Amino acid sequence: MRRTTLTVTLLASLAGCASPEATPVMKEPLQVYAAGSLREVLTEIARDHEARTGHKIALTFGASGLLRERIEKGEGAQVFASADTQHPQRLGAAGGWAPHTVFVRNSLCALTQAQVNATPQTLLETMLNPAVKLGTSTPKADPSGDYAWELFRKADAVRIGAYAALDAKALKLTGGPDSPKPPAGHGTYAWVMDQGQADVFLTYCTNAVASQKEVPRLKVVQVPAALQVGASYGLTVRRGALAPAEAFARALLAPPAQATFARYGFGQP
């Protein structure tokens, strides 16, 4: 029932987005800007969509906050898939984009070095250990960083003073405008951990699992319920975009795409 409601919401919000002059096939590729955590899954979904519809799709990935800033400065994205709902909401509030809808969900996990003996029960103690290097993404630029700081606030309810300690020690290693990029063919988080830049890195569970596949010695630790933070991914379409933009947005909520998201570890909306 929830999926049906969300799909109806998306269709309603997209009503009027497509240009009345829309043509069945765009001459130029559809410009889709998407959160970096969607890189693998959205590349697969876009490839399948191209094969099915003939609409070419150009994907641009990055930290959602930085992508939103690029759009605000005039870049021509027609579909925006963010790792949160606040950045799409901000675009919608400015008037040029449709109201967003949640299309997938994620959550935070801890990616750790092999020598770190953390469990869900001891994760907070491990992160607070002064000898442990704690890595995160960059708040405001990347929702993953915002979610990490939300976790820090929850930690303060478990142990007084935890927020101040975690806020002071966290290393913002990814997601910022000047964050180093990994070499071609390497995932960001696997590379950061492989380089020893952090002992524990808070990232999306989908990223953590993918990083462990790339660097098998890394470990994935679930965040305990008291600290868990959910990530709702928001989808929006530029008002006046041609029909293929709306079609691709609809496709992301359709069962075939949702099955692909689930295969990569994402939760249903």
Can you name each region flagged by the protein language model?
Residues 17-60, 64-65, 69-75, 82-85, ...:
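Exported/periplasmic ABC-transporter solute-binding proteins
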Residues 5-16:
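Bacterial N-terminal signal peptides
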Residues 95-101:
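Central helical "cap/lid" subdomain
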Residues 6, 99, 224-226:
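Residues embedded in well-ordered secondary-structure elements
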